[in-house]
Amino acid sequence: MIHKMYFFLILLFSLFIIVYSAPNRVTRNETSIVYTYSLDSDYYTRFVMYLNATTLRTDIAPNYFDCSQIVNSERYCVFHFADSFSRLWGAVYSRVCTRTVSDPTEDCQSTWITDNAFPEPLNVKFSGYPSTSGGDVVFTGLFLRLAGGPNTLANSFTNPSKTFLIKVHGNFSDPNFNCNNFTATFPPSSGYIKVYFDDTGKSSLQLRYASPTVSSFILDESKKLVTINGDNYFTKNSLVQVFFDGIIQNNINITVNHSQIQVNNFIRVDPGPMSVNITINAVSIDNNYTYCFPAVISSISSVSNHLGGVVTIKGSKLSSTSIIPTIKIGDKQCTFIKSTTTELECQLEPNETGGKHLPVDVNFGGCNSTSSGSDAVTFTYSIPTLSSGTLSNGIVTLIGTNLGTINDSFIQLNSNGAIDNVKNDQFNISSDETTATFKLPLLKCKSFYINFTRVDISANNKPSISAPLLIYVINKPTVSNGSINIELYYIDCPISPSSTPSITVGNSSSATQCSIPSLKNLSEYYQTTCSIPYGTGTNKQFKFKYNSEESNSEFSYEPPKVESRSFSKGLFNITINGNNFGNSTSLIKVYFNGSDISSEIQSLNDNQFTFKRLNSYENGPINITVDGNSNMEPSFYLTLPPVIYSIINKENKTIGCGGLITISGKNLLTSDDKFKVRVLANNENTTVIVPDEKTLIVRANNKDSPLFVSTLIGDDLGPNTTLTYFEPRITVIPTVKNKKDGISIRVGGVSLSGIINASLGISSENVSLSCDLQCSLSPNETFYLSNPILSSNEKDITNSTDCLSCHSMNSIVVDETSGVLYLQLGPTSYHYDVKIEEIQSSLNPSSSNGGERKSSKLSGGAIAGITIGCVAGAGALVGSVFYFKLITRVKKAFN
């Protein structure tokens, strides 16, 4: 009624307005609207959107048509909108402003938005069909509310009896609301409908209510009643049509609005599928529902699996006037022969594998059969039988019938309640299915019975078999106080505490009792422990007896094993500690570094042996064989303590300022703390300068002379000697350097030691000097001379001297060119006339210490031909001819 009023008002207003020319065409898409006019035609300038018949929309963004573009005698008016098209909406009362070619004045009252062509809905999509009980549908598209609503949609403008309003949700005045994406609620109804997006009936979408569905089909044959459950059935019986196999059904009632239909007086005799179609007000089910009327089985006969034969099935609905059934027993087809409503016959071919409790299906047109009782009716072929079972040489042989094949047969052994399965790849069955053989697995108990199954059909007999005792030795005993652990299989179960096994080794006349067998390894077998007499060697025969059964086997003693080594006082003898060496020197062979040293053995027992240490021995592996039994583990690597040959310095009995002492020997760098090499000087530790396996160079920290030098290997004394230091000698007196920051001088000599005092006497004063002693051959030696003829890992220490580096303790100014140098080394005093040379600052640091300088004269004599510096050549002292030259080659590895 409301929509008819809208239409009437528009018609009334149109009588009082001027009708302008219509556009030639309207083009619209997601981003634009274009009106095309003839060049002499009036045209639109903008939209004027209304909320209702009297109220303008004040919230709409500005819009206008740009009509400046003219192409081929046509005017193109392009719509411009300051907002998104999602906000372009208005009532059917909205107008457009127009302008004539001859008059620039806009006319905004004369033309309704729907008078001429206008942008109709575009790209309309919907989320689905509403249920007959009503529901929501989401609509999307463009220009959906340009001339209608906005909060209602109409479904008809011509049939008042079928007209209803569809509610549109959303606040169209909300600037964030998208008027092209909204939800509409449909009232309960059915069939096909039209949905109009404008209030003039120009723009519509063909829609319908959802198709009926079927969720269940319930047949009550006793009442001849069918109940169909589902959805979208609406509420009026007159609108419902139900078809079974295309035949329309009468006596239809909607028993639950929208969701349940009942069909009365339904009768069907034949089994098979039935097609169900439901139509509600011309809207049909999307896909026909299929209901199966099954054949019902109450019993089935059996046939031989070898011969096959006719199988008889009894029940109801076993015959159809239009469908020949397919019958399946297990995974085999049974060929249809004939049937009545209550009985069916089919031919089953031979099946060598047979089967028990096989499923049976009589299928009519895809409809599986059911059973009349609560338990399914199944089919069983002939059952296998076993007549006997024997054991010989570990192989079990079964005799019977219908034993099948390894693929469908299964053998299970039950031994005192423990179950063992024989895998099908571990047994064989004869082609005539009368014999089965398999290797007997290890069982803890002697007696067991056999359960033979074929396709889940157990044989009617379970033969029992007893196996002889079987033993396995699982360890090696030690030479003395040893024992062996024996695994026991096929023993009498249960175990009797009063019955214990015994063992007899070799030709012994007496037996040794073993422990009572106990279960081991998750109860898979029994185990006993037996003591073994003292002995050595391999493959020792023994006899094991338990109850009335005996079993022969053998064992080997554990091989010799080395755990450690030790040395006697003085390191003259070596003792090897371990196990299983025996006590007979005639049965033991010892190899050190591949050489047989058995003859050097001085004492032997099961846990150790001692042999003499020879100087020729070097570190290496030691291997032992006792009575033919070798230690197969990785060989024990024997490391020997150090050997000190001599103290090299003792030939000349002298050492210099550096206190260098050289020790020769072998294995000097042992890592064993018990045999660490130490060198003492006057009972004080020395500092290692050059470490090597064969040579140690150490420095004495004690400067007293004479110097008693002793060596120790661990706590054992080695060679010793007494050394004396060289007498101090001054060999080089260079020119005193007078620098801006003070004066300095470097004095060279031999064996410079003791308390050192120094000063420089000049005419005006006596300047105290502070001196540092730098001994040659120190750990941080700076006086090594490179010798190109040596290898890259060697150094040559040649013609070295000690050095005093003296300098004034304060910055002073000295204007003189000569003076007297006073030196006191311990109790000995020296004084020398020296020259003083002023040293200017230089940009080249190396220029101050390069080249040769003339030496100063010594008091009481002169030194000639000596190069100035702490590394010098030979010097001659006046008054006593003295030549000092120390040449030492030291091999030193560089990292």
UniProtKB/Swiss-Prot annotation:
Residue ranges of domain IPT/TIG in the record: 295-381, 560-638, 642-725
Glycosylated position list: 29, 52, 171, 181, 253, 257, 277, 288, 351, 368, 407, 428, 451, 481, 507, 521, 573, 583, 593, 623, 652, 685, 720, 757, 766, 780, 799
InterPro entries per record: Dictyostelium_Tiger, Ig-like_fold, Ig_E-set, IPT_dom
Transmembrane segments: 862-882
Keywords tagged on the record: Cell membrane, Glycoprotein, Membrane, Repeat, Signal, Transmembrane, Transmembrane helix
Residue ranges, Extracellular side: 22-861
Effect of residue 591 to N: In strain: QS8, QS9, QS11, QS15, QS21 and QS34
GO CC annotation terms, alphabetical: external side of plasma membrane; plasma membrane
SUPFAM superfamilies: E set domains
Localization in the cell: Cell membrane
Membrane topology note: Single-pass type I membrane protein
Reported impact of residue 424 to I: In strain: QS23
Phenotype when the gene is knocked out: Cells are unable to sporulate when in pure population although they will sporulate when in chimerae with wild-type cells. Cells form loose aggregate before disaggregating. Cells aggregate and disperse repeatedly. After starvation, cells completely fail to stream and display cAMP relay defects. Fail to rotate. comC-/tgrC1-/tgrD1- triple mutants fail to form spores.
Cytoplasmic face residues: 883-895
Domain of life, per lineage: Eukaryota
GO biological process, one term: cell-cell adhesion via plasma-membrane adhesion molecules
Signal sequence range: 1-21
Phenotype upon changing residue 247 to V: In strain: QS4, QS8, QS9, QS11, QS15, QS18, QS21, QS23, QS32, QS34, QS36, QS38 and QS113
Function (record text): May be involved in the regulation of aggregation. Activates tgrC1.
Name the UniProt record assigns to this protein: Tiger protein D1
Record organism: Dictyostelium discoideum (Social amoeba)
The organism's taxonomic lineage, starting at the top: Eukaryota, Amoebozoa, Evosea, Eumycetozoa, Dictyostelia
